[in-house]
């Protein structure tokens, strides 16, 4: 049985399935599958999530689907002026999409503020040259926000340390392969929220 994740980019598609499984599988009776669909960018992903989720949940063979998860970066959309905090933006956006899909097998979650935030949990996974210029006063990973979101921070550090840009589909994939999921969950409450949601859905199916 498997989860279907609808994401917005190549980083998610190429990198996060094994990372998420490494946290979930030890807590389940049987290992689960995770299939990630890349919708090529935030705007397209958000526009497509409702129809994609419904199609997956209604397709033949859907009894093998534990649930469909929408996963988009919180960094990207424009928010109404009264939504000023991360919690407000997360909650309002989550509720909006889940109401539209209207299926208990669907959950909407957001990476706060990008999936690269999870990588910031452990500077030891980065090249030594990047570690040597690591910001001493770096905030908790999910507080690295709109001013310089995680991917832009990493791009700046990589350029300064190596003279090369940070490539999401190359460096990101390599780094996620090194990252301990328990370390990331301990440092990222919204990641923990998503994984605990997935764990509860899997256990409800007897896994």
Stretch-by-stretch model annotation:
Residues 2, 13-40, 47-207:
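C-terminal accessory helical subdomains adjacent to catalytic cores in phosphodiester-
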């Amino acid at each position: 049985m498997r989860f279907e994740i609808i994401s917005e980019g190549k980083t998610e598609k190429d990198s996060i399935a094994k990372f998420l499984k490494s946290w979930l599988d030890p807590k389940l009776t049987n290992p689960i599958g995770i299939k990630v669909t890349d919708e090529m960018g935030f705007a397209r992903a958000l526009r497509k999530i409702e129809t994609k989720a419904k199609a997956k949940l209604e397709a033949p063979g859907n009894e093998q689907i534990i649930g469909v998860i929408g996963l988009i970066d919180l960094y990207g959309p424009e928010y109404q002026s009264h939504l000023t905090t991360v919690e407000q933006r997360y909650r309002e956006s989550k509720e909006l999409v889940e109401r539209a899909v209207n299926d208990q097998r669907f959950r909407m979650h957001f990476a706060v503020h990008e999936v690269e935030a999870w990588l910031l949990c452990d500077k030891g996974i980065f090249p030594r040259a990047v570690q040597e210029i690591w910001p001493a006063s770096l905030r908790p990973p999910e507080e690295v926000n709109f001013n310089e979101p995680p991917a832009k921070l990493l791009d700046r550090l990589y350029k300064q340390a190596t003279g090369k840009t940070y490539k999401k589909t190359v460096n990101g994939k390599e780094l996620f392969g090194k990252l301990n999921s328990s370390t990331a969950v301990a440092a990222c409450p919204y990641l923990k929220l998503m994984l605990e949601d997935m764990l509860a859905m899997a256990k409800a199916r007897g896994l």
